[in-house]
């Protein structure tokens, strides 16, 4: 029996290409196009593996993976993304994923990664792994620096969800409907988020969402008033 797989990507052509690569060896049971649909698909199918893009709408891939790992701890997760930056890689493995593959990889690498992850190993694309090694080597050869304090932003998972939806241009009413709470609750969350981040306007909140990796800069829409 073929292992069951979910492919989560908001770009249909990308998802279809990945499905084509996997279909000979895996049973692709769902191709959700946003983070919330991914969570529902995992709860419905309980697949062996999910391949997840980071830049998913409504709920980004990393936060969706947090939900998925809580509801289905046995699932294996591979991030499939264009983001090779170290902070994305670090956050992905903090979330609990087992693999990190770049979309620039060849089909053979993707198949190898899925097999490695399903047999209990961790897989990172060589380009990403080499980047992490290079950064570690650079850090080890640099003279010690006096650490400079940086502000720590600690948003709850729900606050991150609200911030992403604000940055995607959703109105308070739309956000409330999406996460199934009242508009007053959304107003409360936005006020707390603004206070935590030290910002006041929607544009500033959007910039913070980009900084936190909740949305990609190219995906920032016109805001809804």
Please tell me what each predicted stretch does.
Residues 169-204:
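Recognition helix of helix-turn-helix DNA-binding domains
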Residues 88-94, 98-99, 104-157, 161, ...:
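Short, flexible helix-to-coil linker/hinge segments that flank and couple to helix-turn-helix
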Residues 40, 62-74:
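Short amphipathic alpha-helix used as the core "switch/output" element in two-component signaling
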Residues 34, 60-63:
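Acidic catalytic/metal-coordinating carboxylates
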Residues 53, 81:
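Active-site residues of response regulator receiver
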Residues 12-30:
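Two-component/phosphorelay signaling modules centered on CheY-like receiver
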Residues 194-225:
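Basic, Lys/Arg-enriched C-terminal extension of HTH/homeodomain DNA-binding domains
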Residues 6, 26-34, 41, 199:
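Short hydrophobic/Thr-rich beta-strand motif most characteristic of the beta2 strand and flanking loop
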């Amino acid at each position: 029996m073929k292992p069951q797989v979910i492919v989560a990507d908001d770009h249909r052509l990308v998802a279809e290409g990945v499905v084509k690569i996997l279909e000979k060896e895996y049973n692709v049971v769902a191709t959700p196009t946003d983070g919330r649909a991914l969570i529902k698909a995992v709860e419905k199918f309980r697949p062996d593996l999910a391949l997840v893009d980071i830049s998913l709408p409504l709920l980004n891939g990393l936060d969706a993976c947090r939900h998925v790992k809580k509801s289905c701890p046995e699932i294996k997760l591979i991030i499939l993304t264009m983001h090779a930056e170290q902070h994305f890689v670090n956050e992905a493995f903090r979330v609990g994923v087992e693999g990190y593959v770049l979309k620039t990889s060849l089909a053979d690498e993707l198949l190898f990664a899925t097999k490695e992850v399903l047999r209990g190993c961790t897989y990172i694309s060589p380009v990403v792994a080499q980047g992490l090694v290079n950064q570690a080597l650079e850090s080890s050869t640099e003279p010690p620096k006096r650490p400079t304090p940086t502000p720590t932003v600690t948003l709850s998972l729900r606050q991150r969800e609200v911030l992403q939806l604000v940055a995607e241009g959703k109105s308070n009413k739309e956000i409330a409907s999406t996460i199934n709470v009242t508009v007053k609750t959304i107003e409360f969350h936005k006020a707390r988020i603004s206070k935590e981040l030290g910002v006041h306007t929607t544009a500033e909140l959007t910039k913070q969402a980009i900084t936190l990796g909740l949305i990609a800069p190219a995906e920032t829409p016109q805001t809804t008033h």
